[in-house]
Curated annotation (Swiss-Prot):
One of its GO terms (cellular component) is cytoplasm. Pathway: Protein biosynthesis; polypeptide chain elongation. The keyword Transit peptide does not apply. The gene is efp. It holds the Pfam family EFP. The keyword Protein biosynthesis applies. InterPro entries: Elong-fact-P_C, NA-bd_OB-fold, Rib_uL2_dom2, Transl_elong_fac_P/YeiP, Transl_elong_KOW-like, Transl_elong_P/YeiP_cen, Transl_elong_P/YeiP_CS, Transl_elongation_fac_P. This is Elongation factor P.
Amino acid sequence: MVSAGDFRKGVTFEKDGQPCLVVDFQHVKPGKGAAFVRTKYKNLKTGAIREESFNPSEKFPKAVIDTRQMQYLYNDGELYYFMDQENFEQIPLNYEQVEDAIKFLKENEVATIRFYQGQPFQVEAPNFAELEVTDTEPGIKGDTASNVTKAATVETGAVVQVPLFINTGDKVKIDTRTGEYLSRV
């Protein structure tokens, strides 16, 4: 059990049978009345973020989240298949489970998959991805205004904003957490 008074960023707990992650918290001690903990937490299954205040003595079951490194194998049109690096077990995941990560994952790359009570619920791509630009408008010579970007489609199908000097065929480094261009590779 974990009490609301022990909440810190990154603490996991169960609320209404759902795994939750503390995103932000603030211990509030008003001049009058009882202290409370203002908490912003994310439901790890649905991705919904909520804000709620709790009594510091309120207790919640600790959510045990298992994390495994798994290799992305392929997509059969409906499901995305991942293989456990240790026991070579393959698991199929649907689009809702891989939605955010699959934009930056190439086949055979390793991703982090989180499990709750033995069921996979979240896929996380590596923090940085090096991807080839497959489609973008050509840069126009003389267009040198600072911080001007254009849309570029990378090999996984994701669309990212890149500087004007990036052309089709260039490899770019992308921060997968924000989807932002970092550099040319």
